[in-house]
Amino acid sequence: MKKSFFEYLMTQRNPQPNNEVEEFANQAFFDQVFPKQSRDFDEISKYLELNAGYLQSMSIFDSAWQRYLESEQF
């Protein structure tokens, strides 16, 4: 069964983040209304653009999304 993007993102959490994706994961963990079950790029992207002040750049999401897609190929 495929993971949602949020489930994947939670595997990237790190108490001492080494990169922007890890920091994104740490912040998303505390986001109570993040679309946790979604696997839809457009839905998550739109949500982040409108609601995620903690995400400094959408390119961070793009990078995390690419890693997510790569992880789902196996």
From Swiss-Prot:
<protein>
    <recommendedName>
        <fullName>UPF0346 protein PEPE_1063</fullName>
    </recommendedName>
</protein>
<dbReference type="Pfam" id="PF06855">
    <property type="entry name" value="YozE_SAM_like"/>
</dbReference>
<dbReference type="InterPro" id="IPR023089">
    <property type="entry name" value="YozE_SAM-like"/>
</dbReference>
<dbReference type="InterPro" id="IPR036806">
    <property type="entry name" value="YozE_SAM-like_sf"/>
</dbReference>
<comment type="similarity">
    <text>Belongs to the UPF0346 family.</text>
</comment>
<dbReference type="InterPro" id="IPR010673">
    <property type="entry name" value="UPF0346"/>
</dbReference>
